[in-house]
């Protein structure tokens, strides 16, 4: 399973019995009736990524905009203006600066540019370099087997976000990307109108 909250991201999955990866994030549990049957023995990898939750991720992104001194926000809808200034200590350390001032930004709704910007924030330079062959996010030691062979279930923000774009259920990258790209190309005024219409429909359902 993978779970995204406001401050962190968690992941937990069963490792293959042939995987010999050793770490403080690996736990062995036995679900047998008396804990002695090997058929019920499971090796679980579980870790958390502090600072990669939805809220902290947004703060890091906004801090990067402020540090660059840019007025365009490619991740915000066209027509949306917002003021950014106060960011978390974690975000400031991530960007290696403590000097911030309030700035006003204008959304441009550019999906590809937004994706590039967000991807550049994944590598946390405040964490020590990882010495293992495989590492999550560049600094968390991880097993070497292909994670795409693991069936993962997304919770919290993963579910909320995909469901909001009609892409819930089994994850389909192409479908989800297509829906988000279309949404990002909309004007803020149109998004607000759609939200009001949806609220009225939802409210009318009960009355």
Can you describe what each PLM-predicted range is?
Residues 1, 9-207:
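Helical "lid/coupling" subdomains associated with nucleotide-phosphate turnover
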């Amino acid at each position: 399973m993978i779970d995204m909250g406001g401050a962190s991201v968690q992941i937990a999955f069963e490792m293959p019995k042939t995987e010999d990866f050793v770490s403080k994030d690996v736990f062995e549990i036995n679900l047998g009736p008396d804990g002695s049957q090997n058929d019920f023995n499971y090796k679980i990898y579980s870790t958390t990524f502090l600072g990669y939750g939805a809220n902290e991720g947004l703060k890091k992104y906004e801090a990067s905009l402020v540090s660059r001194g840019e007025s365009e926000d490619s991740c915000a809808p066209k027509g949306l203006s917002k003021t950014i200034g106060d960011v978390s200590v974690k975000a400031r350390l991530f960007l290696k600066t403590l000097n911030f001032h309030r700035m006003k930004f204008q959304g441009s709704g550019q999906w590809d540019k937004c994706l590039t910007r967000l991807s550049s924030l994944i590598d946390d330079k405040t964490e020590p370099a990882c010495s293992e062959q495989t590492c999550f996010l560049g600094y968390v030691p991880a097993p070497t087997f292909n994670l795409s062979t693991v069936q993962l279930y997304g919770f919290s923000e993963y579910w909320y976000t995909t469901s909001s774009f009609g892409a819930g259920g089994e994850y389909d990258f192409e479908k989800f990307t297509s829906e988000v790209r279309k949404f990002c190309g909309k004007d803020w005024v149109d998004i607000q109108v759609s939200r009001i219409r949806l609220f009225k429909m939802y409210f009318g359902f009960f009355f």
